Every structure is written in C-alpha cells, then in structure tokens.
C-alpha cells in the first residue's frame, strides 16, 4: 500500500487535541456535566425562577433569563431539554386557546440561542472565532473581555424577545404557578466540590485580565479536580 510518511507529522496531529479552544470547551463541558450529575442545574433553576413570582409575563421573563444564563455555560441542546422538562407541566395547565403557552414554549429555543452568545464556551462557533482572530489577526480575546462586550447584547436581546413574544402571543391567564421539583440527588462532599470548582473556574475566567491566568489554563482546573477526586466516576 501507499506510504503515508511525510504527509503530516504525527506531532501536528496530536497537537490538535491540545488546541487551546479544545481545552476551553472540555473544561466547560466538564462543568456542565457535573452540574447536571449533582443537581446543581435544578437547584439554580428553582432559586433563580422564584423571584419572578406568578405573573405570566414575569414568569416568561424569568424563563428567558434563566435559560440564557444556563446556555452561557451548557450546550444549547442540554439547556433546552432540561428547561422543557420543567416547562411541560406548566404548559399543561393553560386553558385551551391561551396563546401565552406558545410564548413560553418559544422562550426555550429563543433564549438558548441568545444566551450562547454570552461567553466563549456558550457555543463552539464562539471559540472558533476567538481562535481565528488570534491566529489570523493577532487579536487575543479573553473569556472576561468577550463576556463584558457580549452579555449586555444578550440582555438587550432578551428584553426584545420578551416584548415580541408577549405582543405576538399574549397571555389570557392571570396567574402561573411554577413548581420545579426539588433536587432529589444526595448531597455529598462531591456536591460541594462541584459547587466550589464551578465558582472558582467562572471567577478565574472572568478575572483573566487581573490574574494573568489564561482561560485555557483555567479550563484545566475542573478537569484535574474531577479526575483526581473520582467525581466523574461516582
């Protein structure tokens, strides 16, 4: 058969697996997986949605905000699947003909896509854009710098989506009860470890310009912590 020698050095092939963007997403994915595994996502959803009360318009805003927030650190698909599970029982309580349930249902894909813009790990194209800007134009954009510029845009788009959805699909229901089930997963020291690792990683990502620690290096923290403590396996 034909020899493949000289086509590409194996070190170049292997180096692609250690690409900074790949490491950044591995860190983000590990945080998202652990958040779901130990019920952090359910706990956060309960806490964050509670202040929005029972007014349907405010509940819609609450879902838009929470979904966007989760989508900044989790995949859009995982976020949508999780929030749909929370929203399905609520949609079932709507009277027939109430267009408001369409607004709530659409809040999931709309907000998940908007939220993904907010951080470099929100969606793969963001990381690719950062990598290409540095490679071809010499522009280095940190996690914090991206977030500072894009989160205000996300907030504006959330407000626009909130208004548009209400206008197109007005609520006739006057009160909505949001009952998200409690986290039924046992709380262990690993649960607190995941919380702490999540907080420290996000903090270091947001303060890269102050600490001087690259976001790609910070992404190794959750990977190292979860592997060394066996958290992935438990």
Put a short name on every predicted segment.
Residues 34-39, 90-92, 167-171, 207, ...:
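Structural signal for the C-terminal ends of transmembrane alpha-helices
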Residues 1, 75-83, 118-122, 214-221:
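Hydrophobic alpha-helical membrane segments of integral membrane proteins
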Residues 2-98:
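Membrane-embedded alpha-helical segments and adjacent helix-loop junctions characteristic
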Residues 31, 96-128, 133-189:
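Juxtamembrane and boundary regions of transmembrane helices in multi-pass small-molecule transporters
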Residues 66-75, 109-121, 204-210:
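Transmembrane alpha-helix interface/packing and boundary motifs in multi-pass membrane proteins
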Residues 22-23, 57-65, 79, 105-106, ...:
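Hydrophobic alpha-helical transmembrane segments
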Residues 1, 13, 163, 188-192, ...:
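Flexible hinge motifs at transmembrane-helix junctions and intramembrane kinks/re-entrant loops
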Residues 8-21, 139-152, 184-189, 206-218:
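Interfacial loop-to-helix junctions that mark the boundaries of transmembrane helices
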């Amino acid at each position: 058969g034909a020899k493949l020698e000289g086509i590409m050095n194996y070190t170049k092939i292997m180096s692609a697996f250690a690409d900074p963007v790949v490491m950044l997403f591995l860190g983000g994915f590990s945080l998202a997986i652990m958040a779901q595994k130990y019920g952090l996502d359910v706990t956060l959803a309960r806490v964050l949605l509670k202040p929005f009360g029972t007014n349907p318009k405010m509940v819609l805003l609450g879902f838009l905000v929470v979904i966007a927030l989760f989508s900044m650190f989790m995949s859009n698909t995982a976020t949508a699947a999780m929030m749909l599970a929370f929203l399905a029982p609520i949609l079932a309580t709507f009277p027939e003909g109430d267009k408001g349930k369409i607004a709530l249902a659409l809040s999931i894909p709309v907000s998940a896509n908007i939220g993904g813009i907010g951080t470099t790990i929100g969606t793969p194209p963001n990381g690719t854009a950062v990598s290409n800007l540095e490679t071809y134009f010499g522009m280095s954009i940190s996690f914090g710098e991206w977030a500072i510029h894009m989160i205000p845009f996300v907030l504006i788009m959330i407000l626009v989506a909130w208004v548009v959805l209400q206008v197109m699909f007005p609520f006739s229901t006057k009160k909505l009860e949001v009952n998200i089930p409690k986290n039924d997963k046992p709380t262990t020291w690993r649960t607190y470890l995941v919380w702490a690792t999540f907080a420290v990683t996000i903090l270091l990502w947001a303060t890269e310009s102050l600490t001087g620690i690259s976001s790609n290096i910070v992404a190794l923290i959750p990977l190292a912590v979860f592997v060394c403590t066996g958290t992935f396996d438990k």
